[in-house]
Amino acid sequence: VSKPASARLPWLMSTPAILLCAVLLLVPLLLTVILSFNVYDADTGPQAGSFTLDHYLAVVSDPYYYAIFWRTFWISGLVTLICIVIGTPEAYILNRMRRPWRSIMLLVVLAPLMISVVVRAFGWSMLLGPEGLINGAFAAFGVGPFKMLYTEIAVVVALVHVMLPFMVIPVWTSLQKLDPTVANAALSLGASPVTALRRIVLPQIMPGMLSGSLIVFGLSASSFAIPGLLGGRRLKMMATLIYDEYLHELNWPLGAAIALLLLAANLVVMLGWNRMIERRYKKALG
């Protein structure tokens, strides 16, 4: 194979994937952008060919939408933080295990992904409801019942359960690339286990923590099933708000505008977080 032909080969092989991505991602995104600028009439619906900025102005000028944006992002940030705190030690323990226990533990970590998110949401609603298992346990001690369903607590707990595997796997992958002799050398030179973990291990698994946190935050901010089933009608997040605009209010242009603003805000937060962590990672490694 000549050199120019060999240089073109990777592009030729990736062309089907690029076309598929363009058809399934870029085309719908472009149509959503166009829809978000269409004039909406309550009687006839979106007016193709008539464009306006009113939908974006309605979102950025109404405190109601700011409150929902804020709720979405603080819940997503809290879920990401909890997943880091729980998932990083879990990945470390998984990495230190030997066969066959490692395979069993890995199956336990991945098992939630084999069950539908809707089924898991219904399971949590049965646990957290007024007559659920948790309130039943409190009642056995003469306390409660406590309102847990349709609260931020229910949404956070269920999202952590759903998103935790997306944190464990990237961190575990980074730990597998870690040379254990480096940490052992630090211990032999007098460093405490905590110091070796903080100065040697954590900086090297930072890429895994970064990728895991970006996945968890992005999926949490755009999650629909968990907030919809465990948050109820009053505890709205951005995905449930978009759903209401599309299917209840039938205001598709406003729903499209909210979806694009959510996408833009998500990208800003994730790129900012990525930049901050990369700087700390480079600084830690010198």
Model-derived regions: residue spans:
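Glycine-rich helix-loop "coupling/hinge" segments at transmembrane-helix boundaries
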Residues: 44-49, 126, 224-250, 286
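Glycine/proline-centered hinge or cleavage motifs at structural transition points of membrane proteins
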Residues: 189-190, 203
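Short coil/turn motifs that cap or connect alpha-helices
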Residues: 144, 191-193
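The alpha-helix within a helix-turn-helix
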Residues: 186
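Short cytosolic juxtamembrane segments of multi-pass membrane proteins
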Residues: 276-286
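Short, Lys/Arg-rich, polar N-terminal cytosolic tail immediately upstream
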Residues: 1-7
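Short glycine/proline-centered loop/turn elements that form peptide/ligand docking sites
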Residues: 178-182, 281-282
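Membrane-water interface segments at the C-terminal ends of transmembrane alpha-helices
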Residues: 9-42, 57-176, 200-224, 229-231, ...
